[in-house]
Amino acid sequence: MGLFDLLKKKPASENVLADAQPEQNLQPVETQQKGAEPYLGDLEKTGAISELVKTPHSGRDAAWQKEFLQIVSQASFQCGDPQVISGPDGFPYFQLFLPEPNQQFQCYVIDRMKDDFLLNLGYAVVINPVGEQPDWVFTYGDIVNLHVNHIFYTNDETAFSKNRQDEVIQSKEKVLIGQPSEYILPLATRQVLRSFLQANGISVPKVVLMQRQDQIKSHISQDLVFNITPENFGNEEDYRAVMQHLAWFLPRHYAYAGMSENALPEFEPL
């Protein structure tokens, strides 16, 4: 197969498989290194979160969400018991709850947790998972974005492609192939992705960063491309499910695709 191969994009929406992560990931974690300073969150922001979550889910508009997201990473939380649960999507989530008034608690702060263990262990975060609906759910990819961009969600224009459908690279396009930097894929995230793909039958997961320029419109876009094709799976459904799962590991504005190794000799192991 030549370079002008079919770029198999993730589907826009699709059901995902259960048990997306190995169960051994659901273990208590040592959250702080010995001798390190304990987490100290911002109790004022904790109080603000406590007031915000009193608003029913139906009333949480854009202004509510903006305020919540601006302060939640610095607020103080306590962990659940167990610390980590398997979500309905099969992925591991570290449980955080608002502390009880006038009671001592071990403090957890998302901004500290992300670098101490969330990124390395492949954990997402769920806030107040009680009742029918938690107050907020952050995927692992949201935590990655907090690490690299200091915000959970990037809504500004980026170089990543907005196309989520399968594509064919046109002969008039300029294509540049390289490796994603640490800023795009941190080392810890590479390792987490590698473990996930190996658990799903990709023995040597590989990746490239593909930049494409449309000579007619002079538009430049980029995609992460993994060595994943339907031929790696027993059927198209399993392939599509794994491709959909990848979205959980990546910031939401990232675009990614699968392509045969025969089409891209520049692939390198994750």
Language model: regions and residue ranges:
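An interfacial alpha-helical scaffold signature
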Residues: 2-270
